[in-house]
A protein has these predicted regions:
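Core nucleic-acid recognition elements
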Residues: 1-17, 24, 47-157, 162, ...
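Short, surface-exposed, low-complexity cationic segments
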Residues: 29-48, 152-160, 546
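Terminal amphipathic helices with adjacent charged low-complexity linkers/tails
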Residues: 90, 96-110, 315-316, 320, ...
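Conserved, charged catalytic cores of large soluble enzymes
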Residues: 109-173, 197, 242, 251-265, ...
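Conserved oxyanion/phosphate-binding beta-strand-loop segments in alpha/beta enzyme cores
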Residues: 119-127, 133, 162-200, 226, ...
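Function-dense linear segments that define catalytic or interfacial modules
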Residues: 155-164, 177-251, 255, 259-262, ...
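Catalytic alpha/beta core of large soluble enzyme barrels
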Residues: 197, 384, 390-393, 433-438, ...
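Internal maturation/activation junctions in enzymes
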Residues: 222, 425-448, 452, 456, ...
Length: 711
């Protein structure tokens, strides 16, 4: 497309200075232009660095000719880049680069209008996600708020609960706004969607509904599920009370169709509901391992396209695990009669479970006895299910609202953890989440009653992988596990102190006297305080790694929501590569083909270790990290153990056994490529065309379309 020989003039380099948008003057650096052009070309056309260098030379030549000796603005330089791309035949690249600039300019203008010029930068992808799913629109579909206005809307709504306790609404609104607008803390998506609006939709992410063994009971739960999903919440169910397929139904003299058949009805209903909503529906189906239909349940998602709105998990008991270890039979129970229906080899069922998890990622496992050992209100009820991603065990009808602290914002200048800032953020976040309970318009009266009685909240973290990178600690190391454990311990201890203080101010949760906390706290506002959620979408808004997951890629192409592709490079890696002198377009091309730094020449070993990605990490390290956080987390931890495509059945069994041994409350595996539809696809190290790609809303963890509710 470019004729180098037609360019006769030499580059004089008379442009020496550039004026930044904040007014600062810096030295002109051609490399920045070349890098920007390379990323734009590579994202759209897959062109090489030679083309980028050639176009960059033409840009410099034009700047010298038109603006010799002048100090140029960023906008002027970018205008010339757009013009040059078009003139050299790269019309599509020029158009997409121009659109990218316009989106960035739009956001800067909004910040200026609202007086928050010091606010952290939202990424282009964060803006796309916010605009498509979060920001309010009028009846004509026109956007009527900015990201900053969204944060202020939510802050004011949540702070309004202070009037119930004589608090300072304005002061708390500003405090809540500060931690959200600085991306230090974000609540779960339903709170961002609905707080401060007139929709009367709920603010909680997590719900569990009971299913009674009758047609009326089943369809009552179906109706309740629809009401919850309409507001953006996700629902967990325990199907274990439903009689097994083939069992007698006395009222009709017929036979029961079993839990799996009814799961299909719930799945179909969710499909209809999500068609008119902003988010995919999300559900968790749990079945006890001693249910008569356990084998049918284990294979329920073996075929692609079945039960796509469900995560499914087997509730595994200690007794079953002992039977597996001892190669014994165990009893299956008839839910209707509570009597033994038949016996099965525990080993056989275990192997079926492992095989299907290896084959498709489903089912996961919930260690239900471990969950109930930590039930804060055992006299109130038994926990049988969790929210869709498994991190929030709940009683029947109970709900919980979640929020996560961005750990990448909790560092001092020397990249050590700023414990004082983390403490302050925890206390503000606990108050925020407790307030949500009071202003929440509950979809069901039963949910309101049990939620207000226990006042569970789930404060967690995101950006953990970014924090480790800043600290120079590889994810798959004992040091990283120690850091994870210390953070979890600190967050839970401080959240407990914050809840105790709120209990003294406002009163303990009504079931406090029946809880495990009586005698351990003088007062306590919340039955639980901490949860590690996957934070899929809110971590994109915050511009950090998701939950406690490792990086999924160092460089990749992101398919953004308008159909274009953006070249994304981890910003810390980019800065480090430039500082250490190994940054080049050739290195970037190699990284984007495979997503990681393995075997890429020129990258120092210490850098390669710090930027280790999920599929490079041995499965045991995934489990150890989950266990480290679970040790001090009051609810549960959502994390995916990512396995390479060539992982064996034995690898899956080792993961499940280690998770049980280390007292995880559940475990989920995903073997790369085991589902046809993935939102993350790795490139080929030796291929020229195939690169690592990710969908707009993928931030890490399980690389398939999943729950959009918890974060």
């Amino acid at each position: 497309m470019i004729d180098d020989n037609s360019r006769k003039k030499s580059l004089t380099g008379t442009v020496k200075k550039v004026r930044k948008r904040d007014g600062r003057i810096e030295d002109f650096d051609k490399k920045k232009i070349t890098n920007a052009i390379f990323k734009a070309l590579y994202a759209v056309e897959g062109e090489n660095d030679e083309t980028a260098n050639t176009i960059s030379d033409i840009v410099i030549e034009k700047l010298d000719r038109l603006y010799a000796g002048q100090t140029l603005s960023i906008e002027t330089i970018q205008d010339v880049v757009v013009e040059t791309l078009r003139e050299t035949g790269y019309e599509r690249v020029s158009s997409e680069y121009k659109s990218y600039r316009e989106r960035k300019a739009e956001l800067r203008a909004l910040r200026g209008e609202l007086g928050i010029l010091d606010a952290p930068k939202l990424t282009v992808n964060a803006i796309e996600v916010l605009e498509k799913r979060y920001l309010l629109r009028n009846e004509r579909g026109e956007m009527i708020e900015t990201p900053t206005e969204m944060f202020w809307r939510v802050a004011v709504a949540v702070a309004s609960a202070e009037t119930m306790y004589g608090g300072d609404v304005d002061a708390k609104a500003k405090e809540f706004f500060k931690i959200m607008s600085r991306l230090e803390f974000l609540p779960n998506s339903p709170t961002l969607f609905n707080a401060g609006t007139d929709t009367n939709f709920g603010l909680s992410a997590c719900y569990v509904l009971p299913i009674e063994d009758s047609l009326e009971g089943i369809f009552t739960s179906l109706k309740n599920m629809a009401l919850i999903e309409q507001s953006g919440g996700g629902v967990g169910f325990d199907f274990s009370e439903l009689r097994h397929a083939g069992d007698v139904v006395k009222t009709t003299m017929g036979v029961a169709s079993g839990p799996v058949s009814f799961m299909k009805i719930f799945d179909a209903a969710t499909e209809v509901i999500k068609a008119g909503g902003r988010r995919r529906g999300a559900m968790m189906a749990v079945l006890r391992v001693d249910h008569h239909d356990i084998l049918e349940f284990i294979t329920a998602k073996a075929q692609p396209g079945v039960l796509t709105n469900f995560n499914i998990s087997v509730a595994v008991t200690d007794a079953f695990m002992e039977a597996v270890k001892n190669n014994q039979d165990y009893n299956l129970i008839n839910p209707r009669t509570k009597l033994v229906a038949r016996t099965l080899s525990a080993r056989y069922v275990w192997e079926r479970l492992i095989y299907n998890a290896w084959r498709s990622g489903d089912p996961g496992v919930i260690f239900i006895d471990e969950v109930n050992r930590h039930n804060p209100t055992p006299s109130v009820g038994v926990i049988n299910s969790t929210n869709p991603c498994g991190e929030q065990p709940l009683l029947p009808y109970e709900s919980c609202n979640l929020g996560s602290i961005n750990l990448s914002k909790m560092l001092q200048e020397d990249n050590t953890i700023d414990w004082d800032k983390l403490r302050r953020t925890i206390h503000t976040a606990v108050r925020f989440l407790d307030n949500v309970i009071d202003i929440n318009p509950y979809p069901l009266k039963e949910t309101e009653a049990i939620t207000r009685a226990n006042r569970k909240i789930g404060l967690g973290v995101m950006g953990f992988s970014d924090l480790l990178i800043f600290m120079g600690v590889p994810y798959d190391s004992e040091k990283a596990v120690e850091i994870g454990e210390s953070i979890a311990k600190f967050v839970t201890e401080e959240a407990g102190k914050a809840s105790e203080q709120l209990g003294l101010e406002r009163g303990s949760f009504p079931n406090f006297e029946k809880s495990i906390w009586k005698g351990k706290y003088v007062a306590r506002r919340n039955a639980t305080t901490t949860t590690i959620a996957p934070t899929g979408t809110i971590s994109i808004i915050a511009g950090c790694s998701s939950g406690i997951e490792p990086l999924f890629a160092v460089a990749f192409m992101r398919h953004v929501l308008d159909g274009t592709r953006l070249f994304e490079l981890h910003p810390i890696f980019e800065r480090m590569a430039k500082e250490k002198g190994f940054y080049s377009s050739e290195v970037l091309k190699k990284i984007v083909r495979r997503g990681n730094l393995r075997d890429i020449k020129g990258v120092p070993d210490d850098v390669r270790g710090v930027f280790v990605t999920a599929h490079e990490i041995a499965p045991a390290w995934h489990v150890k990290m989950q266990a480290a956080f679970q040790k001090f987390t009051e609810n549960a931890v959502s994390k995916t153990v990512n396995l390479p495509e060539d992982a064996s059945l034995g690898d899956v069994e080792e993961v499940f056994m280690l998770a049980y041994k280390l007292h995880c409350k559940g475990v989920t595996v995903y073997r790369y490529g085991s589902k046809g539809e993935q939102v993350l696809n790795l490139g080929e190290p030796q291929g020229e065309d195939k690169v690592t790609t990710a969908d707009a809303e993928y931030a890490g963890g399980r690389p398939t379309k999943g729950c959009e509710v918890c974060g």
